[in-house]
Amino acid sequence: SRGLGDVYKRQGKYYVEFDKHYKAQIKELMAQGQSEEEAKKNAPVMLEAQEMLRKWEARDPEVYSLWETMNGWVYEGFDVTYKALGVDFDKVYYESQTYLLGKSLVEEGLRKGVFYRRPDNSVWIDLTADGLDEKLLLRGDGTSVYMTQDLGTAYRRFEDNKLDDMIYVVGNEQNYHFQVLKLVLKKLGYADWSDHITHLSYGMVELPEGKMKSREGTVVDADDLIADMVATAREMSAELGKLDDCSEEEANAVSTMVGLGALKYFILKVDPRKTMLFDPRESIDFNGNTGPFIQYTHARICSILRKATEAGIDFSAAVQADYLPEEIDLVKTLTEYPSVVAAAGENFAPSVIGAYVYELAKQFNGYYHDHSILREEDAATRTMRLRLAGQVARVIRRGMNLLGIDVPERM
């Protein structure tokens, strides 16, 4: 099946051709005396693109059919890649379904005197009094821009879902755009909505080879990165003997789980607002602050509990036992989990959960290094330790699940 990478490769060829001709035409027009800004607008290939947009909005059959075909490639690729990452959506809004609503909001703004029309028929809003710039809302030929579409989409989302809050998870290069969106909605009279919009701005992810950015030529192929992560996880897990007792099917499943877990955790453990450098091999280190370290801790506890069950040890009921200071500390850490989740939600910071789960896993490993569980001779103490280990595994599993990361029971 084709993933997002195949879509980028297919469309990338067209973009390369477009970019080559576009730059050549700009250079030629500038040589004829036009400014760079004028040349960018008047380049024949750009005028053709603008004409196609006009035809698309007019539902020209040929252009609309081409658009549907190309969009089909994109959605197909999205579906494959999202499925590999374990991502799905309850509802998807398409700009093609909301831009007309956006246009009607622009007309509403004109009637209210919030927007103004320039001689070339384009529609703008002047936000200079608010410390921002003038913003284009509708082109002179009547076609929409990003802001038009986002106005319509925001309106539709609030209307459809009666939202308390709406969070946009979009890169930090769009900070200004969302300042404008909120202010425009407010000036249109939708302060109840604009006051409940949050832009969760995130920094770029960089690889040793360069930045991962979706609108520039430096984009990294998501499908290739996922495949590389799974292959690296398989290689490193095998080197450490963590797949020795696995069948081929189990080894494939564990490698996929570890590879994706490493990728997700390495990104999510960092405050989303920060730019980060992603190192694939470092992310699969079984001894550091990584997803695989936490996954291995969970699998290790599951192995202990499995062996106890196989040995006929019943630890289903609570018992009276004396707790060591380290065990009391583990219990205290476990009781912090609900407040950690609440803090992560309030601050839109999954990294808080990542840090907590890592510390819990590290704390358990230190405890288990110093104290036996299965070989403990006192039955009550052994039962208490098994139940405590089970609670640690349960919280690790829940925390990682909130991060979208699966944890294996065997490794």
Which stretches of residues belong to each language-model region?
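Non-catalytic interaction-recognition regions
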Residues: 1, 5-411
